[in-house]
Structure formats: structure tokens, C-alpha cells
Amino acid sequence: MTRQVEQIAITHIARHKGLDPATITPDADLAALGITSLDAIAIAYQIEEDLGIEIPNEEIEGLRTVRDLIDGLHRLTARRE
């Protein structure tokens, strides 16, 4: 599921901001991608729907990079399994 989680995160970021997913790397800074706090909430909601998890607001507030999001999603999906 590791690669799947990464792909879901990148796909939702790209779709939300109208970017090419191929241009988004795990080390990309969310602010540099134009992701605001409201964008992060909207993206998190979409990811929650796809993965069947709940992302706590505290997780969203601490995100700085795409990797931060991916790592948080891995923790949350591991708890579910």
C-alpha cells in the first residue's frame, strides 16, 4: 500500500491545484506548490474518502512537504489494518 498511498496523495494534490502529477515529488514543499491551509483541508477530505480513514486536524496543520503527508497517511492506514 506504500506506493498506492503516495500516488493517492500526489494525485489529489495535482488535481486540486491543476498540476501535472509527474512534476510533484515527495520532497516538494506544499507552500511552493501553492497549497494553502484551506487547500490542505480539502485535499485531506478527498484522501479520507479514498482511503477510508480520518485525518486529524493536528496532522493537517503540521504538514510542510508532500512527504509529511505521505508519512502521516502511512501511520493512519497502519492503525486501521
Per-range role (PLM):
Residues 43:
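Residues within the DNA-recognition helix of helix-turn-helix
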Residues 37:
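Catalytic nucleophile serine of serine hydrolases
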